[in-house]
Amino acid sequence: MNKEKELRAASPSLRHVQDLSSRVWILQNNILTAVPRKEQTVPVTITLLPCQYLDTLETNRGDPTYMGVQRPMSCLFCTKDGEQPVLQLGEGNIMEMYNKKEPVKASLFYHKKSGTTSTFESAAFPGWFIAVCSKGSCPLILTQELGEIFITDFEMIVVH
């Protein structure tokens, strides 16, 4: 597919996300949380759109991507709580960010694919990745500790 055409996405890609232990992302009290997949578990649908302005961002970190939640419509963004970068879910539409004249770094993640897994690094806080704890149910966070206490590799399942 032509990269330029791909950047002019008409609508977001829809995905369910899980870690390699089959813990899926759900929305629980307006917080993105990873929980073990069970028969009744309904994963949240994540929306993804590429950033149109690649020349203003770092290269070789992955594809700059806006991430959101389909219902209720909201978007992921990174901010600071004191000195600590944190992951937040806020009101908004990733289509609006996609259509802005410049990148919205707080809401951009470098999506890097490796085989069947993906990582999501904050564009606003390089070196900080979306992560979940290694066991049980837990909210999504940002971490710099790759593959140690937290899981940063996720599988993306296409939603039709």
From Swiss-Prot:
Any one of the GO CC terms: cytoplasm
Protein induction: By IL-22 in normal and psoriasis-like skin.
Stored SUPFAM superfamilies: Cytokine
Protein keywords: Cytokine, Cytoplasm, Immunity, Inflammatory response, Innate immunity, Nitration, Secreted
Keyword Cell inner membrane in record: no
Tissue-level expression: Highly expressed in embryonic tissue and in tissues containing epithelial cells. Elevated expression levels are detected in chronic kidney disease; expressed inepithelia from the distal convoluted tubules (DCTs) to the cortical collecting ducts (CCDs) in single nephrons (at protein level).
GO biological process: one example: positive regulation of cytokine production
GO molecular function, one term: interleukin-1 receptor binding
InterPro entries recorded: IL-1_fam, IL-1RA/IL-36, IL1/FGF
Modified residue annotations for 3'-nitrotyrosine: Y98
Disulphides: none
Spans through the membrane: none
Main localization (coarse): cytoplasm
Modification after translation (UniProt): N-terminal truncation leads to a dramatic enhancement of its activity (>1000-fold).
Subcellular locations according to the entry: Cytoplasm; Secreted
Complex and partners: Interacts with TMED10; the interaction mediates the translocation from the cytoplasm into the ERGIC (endoplasmic reticulum-Golgi intermediate compartment) and thereby secretion.
Family: Belongs to the IL-1 family.
Name listed for the protein in its UniProt record: Interleukin-36 alpha
Organism: Mus musculus
Record gene name: Il36a
